[in-house]
Amino acid sequence: MIKLKLPDGSVREHEVPLDGLAFAESIAKSLAKKAVAIKIDGQMKDLSTVIDRDAEVEIVTRETPDGVDLLRHDASHVMAEAVQELFPGTQVTIGPVIENGFYYDFARAEPFKAEDLEKIEQRMREIVDRDETITREVWDRDAAVEYFKKIGEIYKAEIIASIPAGEQVSVYRQGNWLDLCRGPHLPSTGKLGKAFKLTKLAGAYWRGDSRNEMLQRIYGTCWANENDLKAYLTMVEEAERRDHRKIGREMDLFHLQEEAQGSVFWHPKGWRIWQALEQYVRRRIDAAGYVEVRTPQLLDSKFWEQSGHWGKYRENMFVVPDEVPSTDEDAPVLSGKAKLMAIKPMNCPAHIQIFKQGVKSYRDLPLRMAEFGCCHRNEPHGALHGLMRVRQMTQDDAHIFCTEDQIKEETEAFVALLESVYEDMGFTGTKLRLATRPDVRAGTDETWDKAEKALEEALKALGKEFDFAPGEGAFYGPKLEFHLRDAIGRSWQLGTLQLDFVLPERLDASYIGEDGNKHRPVMLHRAILGSLERFIGILIENYEGRFPMWLAPVQAVVTTITSDADPYAEEMLQKLRDAGIRAELDLRNEKINYKVREHSVAKVPAIFVAGKREAEEGTVSIRRLGSQQQQTMKLDEAIKALAEEATPPDMR
């Protein structure tokens, strides 16, 4: 007799072992029809897996997140089979599931063309119609290497050869086609359905290393049903329309260029948004009891070795010698004794150095230390994406040094501050995730137990709902992630709160406790916006460039119908600027409709229009962005109303 416990807590008993599909049928035939896999003690397995012991069991259906991921996994295999049928001689490499879809990398002499995607998609539909049975086989590792070499799959053979000798490997057979894979998979290709779409072509280096050969990557998306697929494709279309790079050009906010990959050239209008954000955050953290600091960009590699970052982040750090030749000809005569210096990829170790200056007492805690810290990370060229993924970034970074007893209170205060900031930015409904210890980590299990428990208890005390993200914590401590949804439904991970018992120990930070002895402070790493670059990119796309008045780079443009009103327009401009409004003047000899249209395209919230009559009466006609109507007001009243609207939320 085996006892199988379901997620609702109920237990079902079976006299003989049975596979996942039979177990689903024993509950309900309708459930068995929806089933795509089974979870046994939290591990995803094929439906054909036999359950022969007591276990916690969950039937995975296609509509669940795990089910959708499985569909995407199978879609990548069906795509690979279709590619090899249509383009014989193509080698397959890897094909993982990614957010909202999947991809597969192929090795092929000739490049794929955009029109090939429709052919591949059509063949995928045919493979689904064939309803090919998918079965798992276990092979000897060496035999698998030889087999894949024999059929010309050099990349697969290389992957298998990296598995320790003597181990077995799993291969999935899909009709007459097979692939190396851990699984699990659907019972057959017919279970996949046809709610998939191939989306784009790209290049990718084998194993992500630019020294290796270039492969061809095909991206796709797959969903549980056609409605979900259509909704996603509509969202993608809307996202393309809102692309911050396109809007950034149209609004003259910033640009990027090859000579400074991953770094942003901020134009005056874009820099105004940056400054408005930075000043807003500075006021909020000042009111919350933070002190602001500034730390060096370059630090000795020994410093990073001590902190533990050298071993973890070395390949993502920009490293330079502290002895630089004066000319290119002098380069070969470096002494070889130069120290290696790293441009900081993060601020936390430097903040500990400030904390360590002078003796700290328990009375000094909590100490909340903030920095708009400019950091550099050596991101791969192919990963860079506008403002969303850069090499040079500025973070609204802060570290809270506190006692263990203060963790709950500090977490509560931070969450309240963060949610207030997001609300001011127009975001509501923050989703929380608690990311726990990764496989590669610093510190002992005992330390991690303490850190994870402290953060979990603080969240429960706040009454906040949260999900666990096993294995996704930082290498020095568990992490609380804050996710937002934008205007078109996309989720963005922005704020973080990371609990760290490790770094203060490594860098010997201490304070004198009430007992007169030295103690290690707890270190809370926290950010609200994340990087300002990325947050501005998100704001651009969320608002489609139509920023709320207080963030708009140009809040008002003054323009004229005839040149007779030019002196009055100049007077209006000065009054607007005196009221603290970011205003510009347009006295061009163009038709008023043309000028209004141009400034509307530039997303200016308010256009002040003046003609001869307005000049004589001391009034102004106001056209608001997105409205076809004009409102005529006394100039002073209009400026007062606009100034109130332009006031940052924390100053109202």
UniProtKB/Swiss-Prot annotation:
Coiled-coil region list: none
CC cofactor note: Binds 1 zinc ion per subunit.
CDD domains for this protein: TGS_ThrRS (cd01667), ThrRS_anticodon (cd00860), ThrRS_core (cd00771)
Subunit relationships: Homodimer.
Gene3D superfamilies in UniProt: 3.10.20.30, 3.30.54.20, Anticodon-binding domain, Bira Bifunctional Protein, Domain 2, Threonyl-trna Synthetase, Chain A, domain 2
Annotated PANTHER family: THREONINE--TRNA LIGASE, CHLOROPLASTIC_MITOCHONDRIAL 2, THREONINE-TRNA LIGASE
Keyword Phosphoprotein attributed: no
GO molecular function, one term: tRNA binding
Presence of the UniProt keyword Disulfide bond in the record: no
Pfam assignment, any one: tRNA_SAD
Required co-factors: Zn(2+)
Name of the gene this protein is made from: thrS
Species the sequence originates in: Parvibaculum lavamentivorans (strain DS-1 / DSM 13023 / NCIMB 13966)
Name listed for the protein in its UniProt record: Threonine--tRNA ligase
